[in-house]
Regions:
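Asp-box/BNR beta-propeller blade signature and adjacent active/binding-site loops
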Residues: 1-152
């Protein structure tokens, strides 16, 4: 099953699912727990999405801004443990200016297994930054009130 995350013209992300490899999409919905960029604008900010390879689990990690200001700042990551239905935990990666982001997960059976790599515009030196973290670090974040973190 494929999850598609779309950047709409409002302050929340929209999602859809495909069961045929992306040929068709259904279950369009607004994801209330996922902000789409700074909340004082009618447009969003490109975010990242990756799946962690954890046997028996469907863990997604999403990156985007988490600010109510009209500024692009506070790049934050969130985790879902149920294929994107809920997003119960978030953690701030960088508190300053930040914007577009993309992510990838490490490959099973390599030294990168278990790591998430977040590339984002901004950071302590401006330009672009790559942050590396794992699920244990993200789980030390803030509960969002959207679902529960399962025992892992």
């Amino acid at each position: 099953r494929i999850h598609w995350d779309k950047r709409p013209n409002n302050t929340r992300r929209r999602g859809a699912y495909s069961k045929d490899g992306g040929q068709t999409w259904g279950d369009w919905h607004i994801i209330e727990a996922l902000p789409d960029g700074h909340q004082q604008r009618s447009y969003g900010c490109m975010g990242g999405l990756t799946r962690l390879a954890v046997k028996g689990r469907d863990i997604l990690v999403f990156s985007n801004l988490d600010t109510s200001n009209a500024k692009r700042e506070k790049i934050t990551v969130r985790a879902s443990f149920d294929a994107g239905k809920t997003w119960p935990v978030k953690r701030l990666v960088f508190d300053g200016p930040s914007a577009y982001s993309s992510m990838t997960s490490g490959r099973p059976g390599t030294d990168t297994e278990g790591w998430v790599y977040l590339h984002f515009e901004g950071g302590p030196k401006g330009g672009s930054t790559v942050a590396k973290f794992n699920l244990a670090w993200l789980l030390e974040g803030t509960p969002t009130g959207d679902g529960a973190v399962p025992r892992l």
